[in-house]
Design a protein with these regions (language model features):
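Charged, compositionally biased N-terminal leader segments and the immediate start
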Residues: 1-19, 83, 87-89
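Generic alpha-helical secondary structure signal
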Residues: 3, 33, 46, 77-80
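Alpha-helix boundary/N-cap detector
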Residues: 3-7, 26, 73-77
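General helical secondary-structure elements
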Residues: 8-9, 33, 65, 81
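Amphipathic alpha-helical packing elements
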Residues: 10, 18-54
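Charged, low-complexity surface patches
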Residues: 15, 40, 75
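Amphipathic alpha-helical binding modules
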Residues: 54-93
């Protein structure tokens, strides 16, 4: 399941970059560690605010983390953080 998540996240990052969102480089091998770190902290993921401004939060790590295909990869705190960030930014499911 992790491999599918990483592939999906890398594809979403690529799509975000194509619409002008600048993201820090990330190696696929570090993706899960980066995802857990981003979702367990208080800061939004890389590019979240810009994606919100562009109304493309579907490309965010937070949206991917609450996707039913991948919820098993994250603990309750991480999933709740992702959900609260999305709801606070006005994301519609």
């Amino acid at each position: 399941m992790e491999e599918k998540f990483v592939a999906a996240w890398m594809a979403k990052r690529e799509a975000a970059q194509k619409i002008g969102v600048r993201l820090r480089p990330m190696e696929p091998a570090d993706a899960m560690k980066q995802a857990h770190r981003a979702l367990s902290g208080h800061r939004e993921s890389d590019g979240f605010r810009i994606l919100a401004d562009k109304k493309r939060l579907d490309l965010s790590l937070e949206a991917l983390a609450v996707d039913k295909r991948f919820t098993g990869l994250f603990n309750d705190e991480e999933a709740n953080n992702a959900l609260m960030r999305l709801l606070s930014a006005g994301y519609r499911f």
